[in-house]
Amino acid sequence: MLTTRRLNAYIAATVMVLAVLIQQVVTEGLLSDFDRSARLTARSIRASHDVFSVTVMLGLRGIILTVCLPILGWVSLKRRSWLPIAGFLIVLVFETGIAGALKISVGRIFPYQYESFFSRMMIGQDEMAFPSGHAANCVALWGYMVWYFTQAGSVLRRAGIWLVVLASCIVGVSSWLIRTHWPTDLFAGYAVGFSALVAVIGLYTALGFNPEATTHYSQEAHRETADAQ
């Protein structure tokens, strides 16, 4: 289970990462130079837009909701409890709210806006690149599903974590290659998603809603997930 000490450490670490990234982006520090270099590298690679515009959708909110909500709805209905789906929705609100507030306050343009005359004309109207919502969605929402339906220390939990990491990397690399986000946007998105996920896990644990509270409860969650799938 997530202890208070670990929760505080995780939140503090992600806040520090976000603070550094925001400072570097706003002041155009060394990481901004890295971003510009990464954009030129991605442009020179000329990756297939058709392929990577599909793989980046692993972090698309609509697709994640389409997959997860029916499963969570089924489990909530069968258990006659709002807890499974409510936790997911709280994570969604947290990460969307944090990411949205940062997008508005930082006001950063997208890499592709350098690519054509028309896109450059849009500068000043569409400055919502930082942080990446796709990266935040991937960590927060897929991460919640892994946490809720697996037991700590189990093979399924470890496999699920690695799948979330893999999906997050695919989203990040895809977004970089098709130049929809700067690398620092993606790192910030990961931090936002992780902080939202950890906050909700901490909340559920503090309220006694953690599915690992009893062995019986955890086994029931496994059975219901299998039924829903």
Where are these regions (language model features)?
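Aromatic-anchored segments of alpha-helical transmembrane domains
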Residues: 17-21, 93-100, 166-176
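Hydrophobic, aromatic-rich transmembrane alpha-helices
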Residues: 66-78, 143-148
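N-terminal transmembrane-helix/juxtamembrane module of multi-pass inner/ER membrane proteins
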Residues: 1-67, 104-122
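Transmembrane helix-loop junctions in multipass membrane proteins, especially transporters and channels
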Residues: 27-32, 80-81, 104-112, 180, ...
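Membrane-embedded catalytic cores of phosphoryl/pyrophosphoryl-handling enzymes
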Residues: 116-229
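Alpha-helical membrane-inserting segments
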Residues: 42, 98, 102, 106, ...
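Interfacial segments of alpha-helical transmembrane regions
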Residues: 5-13, 70-98, 161
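Mid-bilayer segments of alpha-helical transmembrane spans in multi-pass integral membrane proteins
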Residues: 96-101, 131, 135
